[in-house]
């Protein structure tokens, strides 16, 4: 696992974990250069990225290289003005979107129950959509959907969604299909939260 990060923030990632691999990047072109290394078999964009043009361009660059992708947080919100641009870029790929209700509503205008909305969203964008909450719904473009039932209240702690996104990516790059990786990631995340509690 390598964390691509602006140079001015590298020390934040390596201070307590000197063995953590980091690569500096300033622009989306720098990020695209990192993606030329085929050993980078999966890409997570979103947590802490910022809602800006660089995040927008990084998402599109990641989608273009055809690797496994998880998009969370800012990587979703940055497309709120033009969600179709995101959907065109990712449709049919091994990609998982992990929005909470607020992020979901910025991309999709569906009404109805959570299960129906998640299914419609997955069908529309052509990838797995994981709509987070106490009853997280994981939906596939083919209509299959699952509802997680083991979520403890400790998952409302900041950062648990980032951990979830990373867990899903780890499963994806090991060859697990997107729907199964999302389901397993949600279950593992909830189980860990129940075991370790808040913090």
Q: Where do the language-model regions lie?
A:
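Small-residue (G/A/S/T)-rich helix-start motifs and N-terminal tracts that mark the onset
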Residues: 1-70, 77-96, 101-199
């Amino acid at each position: 696992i390598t964390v691509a990060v602006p140079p001015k923030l590298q020390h934040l990632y390596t201070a307590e974990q000197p063995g953590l691999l980091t690569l500096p990047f300033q622009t989306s072109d720098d990020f695209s250069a990192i993606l030329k290394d085929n050993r980078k078999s999966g890409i997570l964009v979103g947590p802490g990225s910022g809602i800006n043009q660089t995040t927008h361009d990084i998402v599109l660059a990641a989608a273009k290289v055809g690797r496994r992708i998880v998009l969370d947080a800012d990587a979703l919100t940055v497309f709120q003005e033009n969600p179709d641009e995101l959907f065109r870029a990712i449709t049919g790929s091994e990609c998982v979107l992990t929005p909470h209700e607020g992020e979901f509503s910025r991309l999709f205008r569906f009404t109805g129950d959570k299960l129906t909305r998640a299914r419609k969203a997955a069908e529309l964008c052509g990838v797995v959509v994981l709509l987070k909450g106490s009853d997280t719904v994981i939906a596939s473009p083919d209509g299959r959907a699952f509802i997680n039932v083991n979520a403890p209240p400790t998952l409302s702690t900041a950062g648990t969604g980032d951990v979830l996104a990373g867990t899903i990516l780890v499963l994806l790059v090991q060859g697990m299909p997107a729907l199964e990786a999302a389901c397993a990631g949600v279950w593992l995340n909830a189980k860990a939260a129940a075991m370790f509690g808040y913090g």
